[in-house]
Amino acid sequence: DVFWQWLATFSVFIDNPVNIGYKVAGYDLPQLNIQEIIVDGNEPIKETLTLTERRQARKDSLTLRCEKAAEIANNSDEQWLIWCDLNDESAKLHEVINDSVEVKGSDKPEHKSNSMIGFSEGKIKCLVTKPSIAGFGMNWQNCHNMIFTGLSDSYEQFYQAVRRCYRFGQKKPVNVYIIISAKEGCVKENIERKQADFLK
């Protein structure tokens, strides 16, 4: 705390060119639309589950969540970034989503780089992968639609994955779908709590 108080005595923080009279063009972000879809109920169950119970809930709803993701992506001509956390989710998503390319951790580096470059160039309609593989560092302003087929407890992974498309240079509103089972409500609440802590 003392360090930050000392820093505040002489520093100025500028988070946008508008703060010092410049135009915002190029540094403005489009609208971010986040929609939650609960595949097996109307309301998330907010009770705290053990890690084992949460894993079982994800396994139990895997087919429903993947089919819902496929319904959304297959009814669109636009590019889609499909995020998952489990290998079984990845395989099922690739199976049910038309024109999808799957990038797994066990893939050869050539496949990973060719797939990510192909997605960047618009040659791949749907890229199925994990935030731990492609959630950091990629610039995909060419895409403005993504689906999370479930969530992990990591706010950082969620934030970084969304920021692959929601970044400076993005010309269209970014649509983020979060597809979860009712029993995963506590995971989403945990992410939201971490986000609120981050923004304080």
Segments and roles (model prediction):
Residues 81-83, 91-92, 98-134:
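Conserved helicase ATPase core of P-loop NTP-dependent helicases/translocases
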Residues 83, 129-130, 148-150, 178-180:
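Conserved beta-strand segments of the P-loop GTPase G domain that flank and frequently precede/overlap
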Residues 127, 146-147, 165:
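Short, well-ordered beta-strand core segments
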Residues 138-151, 174-178:
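A short beta-strand element within the Helicase C-terminal
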Residues 153-200:
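A conserved SF2-helicase RecA2
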